[in-house]
Amino acid sequence: MPARLRPELTELPAYTPGRNVPGAIKLASNETVQEPLPSVRAALAEAGSLINRYPDNGYAELRSHLAKHVDMPPEHIAVGCGSVSLCQQLVQITATVGDEVLFGWRSFETYPLVVRVAGATPVQVPLVDHTYDLAAMAAAVTDVTRLIFVCNPNNPTGTVVRPAELRRFVESVPPHILIAIDEAYVEYVREDFTDSLALVREHPNVVVLRTFSKAYGLAGLRVGYAVGDPDVITTLGKVYVPFSASSLAQAAAVASLGAAEELLARTNDVVTERARVTSALREAGYQVPPSQANFVWLPLGERSTEFAQASAEARIIVRPFGTDGVRVTIGAPMENDAFLKFSRAWR
């Protein structure tokens, strides 16, 4: 007799990662193409000699450095195995059967998965112009809303909400509902942007999520952090899987913060390429929403899968999202050139 599993998980779709095809250009997972800095590699080498020991489960050194980075005390900071694990923890501490978790759609595909695993109900509010519709989200709040995700910049569309709109939204939400502002791509933003940390200081029900996977180039090590009210941070720790951020990840994150200026200067190259790719795609006849992330979004609708399959045949791997569109990571200039050549021919 097979083991009895939770029946409600049967229809739950599995997370679909970006494809890896040897020898192909991978523009599917929003990774940086640049290697870790020498100082980060040196920190990893040193930490590697101690991997026979468990990592610091309290992240004392990393939290101390993060506290300086965000100019807030360490008790306002939680560390996780990437910000995605913190998303799951936020759901776990706020929502259960009969509760609702609210977010725009299409957005980060992990949101509905972790909500359903918790037994809660995901409420997806359609985007407007590929951007979070905060007015509609405010109207969707009910007596059983427990958590709201605002992905900003939004993944996979790359758009951001106006600072004044986000502030008004936060102020309109009842204070017992937690608001998670997911800023995985914040380092790539170049237009007027919300001071989310100010919102954390002003509103105990706001928490900000950030990651070292994108601009800091540590996607393979899995480390992210949350900034929020100490009560929220303490409760996150109660549902945290011990030792899930390795000693290597912690050492690399500390070293990366020490080299933050050099690392973040690299984002300027991505932003320059983002503008070039966006302009070229628009000239080729594509609709491309304004992106503030390290990728662009092509709302191709029913042709999304066709485009992605043809791209794969050309040895360029992009990320389709059902019948909504295709997300394309900004890669190295030569990789972007290859993608643009394919896109012009396909069009």
UniProtKB/Swiss-Prot annotation:
The keyword rRNA-binding does not apply. It holds the Pfam family Aminotran_1_2. Disulfide bonds: none annotated. Its cofactor is pyridoxal 5'-phosphate. Aminotransferase that catalyzes the conversion of aromatic amino acids and 2-oxoglutarate into corresponding aromatic oxo acids and L-glutamate. Belongs to the class-II pyridoxal-phosphate-dependent aminotransferase family. Homodimer. This is Aromatic amino acid aminotransferase. The gene is pat.
